[in-house]
């Protein structure tokens, strides 16, 4: 008789396990039913706070770069060797009262006479250990052709230009004569720029020149006059010759800088060039072109109390997008010099116009 095989109690029951697993899954699904799983999201308050931090940080950087300016000094506060913004602004007043001084005008002759008289006075009052030479330089004829910028592939012929050149030499350093630093700006203006002024007001901490055309570039010339006066009193304060070039013809194709750098005998002694410019009527004077050697900009950054600059400006300027040029282009391309090009550009909308009646703040000087 055959016996029916009995199922072992130890044999695995797979069907039971499957049913058990299914029941557990169903139970977990029931437990999780109605529970929403959310991803982490930032609240609107967090985004608002982040935006406020970015705005405040940007404002702080702007304030530090462009609004952190020195307190203007009077001549008494600056002393013999210091720089007085109030004294410089007096030169702005005198030059802008002449009206537009374009090449060939009577006003440009008066402006040259004013600058020459101020330089002769600096020569008379200079420290006995500083040699001061003043040269009225006349250019008969010349021509320039630049490799880039708005004057690329254009030949510009110029004639009958007058410049004033000042050279300062420390008597105790004879080698300084062959190692000069050039500081340059232009006296001439465009014909559309008016020079009339209504008044000249003095305040406790600021002084504004409310005159039309105080920018390009009577303010630069005034800075150079005051800077030259201060340097003339430094007996042992400098080791290189300093040449100040007050040129004419910048508005006519950079002719003034080109004629000086190619024809004046002192130009061969220059090792670095600093150009002062204006493309507006206020703001902080900042570097917008430099190089090609980094020595000048590195030195400026290490010693300047209020350094400011933006290398992006140089790229934009060199691209030709902005149809303008400065004397620094001549010093860099023609003379092969390294250096710095300073500019202030607030209220650029009134640049080179007869309605440039926005006040020139004293701290811009």
Listing of model-derived features with the role each one plays in the protein:
Residues 1-35:
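Short, low-complexity, Lys/Arg-enriched N-terminal segments of secretory-pathway carbohydrate enzymes
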Residues 8, 15, 20, 41-42, ...:
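Intrinsic low-complexity, intrinsically disordered segments enriched in polar/basic residues
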Residues 28, 32-34, 68, 80, ...:
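Intrinsically disordered, low-complexity regions
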Residues 34-48:
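Membrane-entry signal-anchor segments at the cytosolic-membrane interface
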Residues 46-60:
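Hydrophobic membrane-insertion alpha-helices, especially the h-region
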Residues 63-73:
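Aromatic-capped interface at the extracytoplasmic side
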Residues 71-365:
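Soluble extramembrane regions of membrane proteins in the secretory/endomembrane system
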């Amino acid at each position: 008789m055959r016996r029916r095989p009995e199922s072992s109690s130890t044999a695995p029951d797979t069907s039971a396990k499957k049913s058990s697993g299914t029941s557990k899954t169903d139970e977990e699904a029931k437990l999780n039913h109605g529970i929403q799983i959310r991803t982490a999201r930032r609240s609107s308050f967090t985004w608002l706070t982040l935006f406020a931090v970015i705005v405040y940080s940007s404002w702080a950087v702007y304030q530090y770069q462009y609004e952190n300016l020195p307190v203007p000094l009077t001549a008494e506060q600056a002393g013999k060797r210091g720089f007085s913004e109030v004294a410089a602004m007096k030169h702005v007043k005198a030059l802008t009262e002449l009206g537009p001084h374009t090449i060939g005008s009577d006003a440009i002759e008066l402006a040259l006479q004013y600058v020459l008289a101020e330089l002769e006075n600096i020569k008379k009052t200079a420290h006995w250990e500083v040699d001061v030479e003043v040269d009225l330089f006349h250019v008969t004829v010349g021509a320039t052709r630049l490799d880039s910028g708005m004057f690329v592939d254009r030949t510009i012929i110029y004639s009958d230009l007058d410049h004033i050149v000042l050279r300062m030499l420390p008597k105790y350093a004879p080698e300084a004569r062959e190692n000069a630093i050039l500081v340059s700006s232009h006296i001439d203006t465009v014909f559309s720029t008016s020079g009339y002024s209504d008044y000249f007001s003095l305040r406790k901490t600021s002084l504004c020149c409310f005159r039309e055309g105080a920018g390009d570039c009577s303010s630069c010339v005034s800075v150079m006059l005051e800077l030259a006066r201060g340097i003339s009193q430094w007996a042992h304060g400098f080791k290189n010759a300093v040449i100040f070039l007050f040129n004419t013809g910048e508005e006519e194709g950079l002719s003034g800088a080109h004629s000086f750098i190619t024809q004046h005998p002192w130009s061969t002694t220059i090792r670095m060039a600093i150009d002062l410019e204006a493309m507006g009527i206020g703001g902080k004077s900042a570097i917008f072109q430099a190089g090609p050697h980094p020595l000048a900009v590195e030195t400026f950054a290490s010693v300047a109390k209020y350094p400011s600059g933006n290398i992006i400006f140089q790229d934009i300027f060199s691209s030709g997008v902005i149809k303008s040029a400065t004397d620094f282009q001549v010093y860099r391309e023609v003379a092969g010099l390294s250096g710095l090009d300073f500019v202030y550009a607030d209220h650029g909308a009134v640049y080179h116009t007869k309605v440039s009646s926005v006040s020139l703040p004293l701290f811009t000087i």
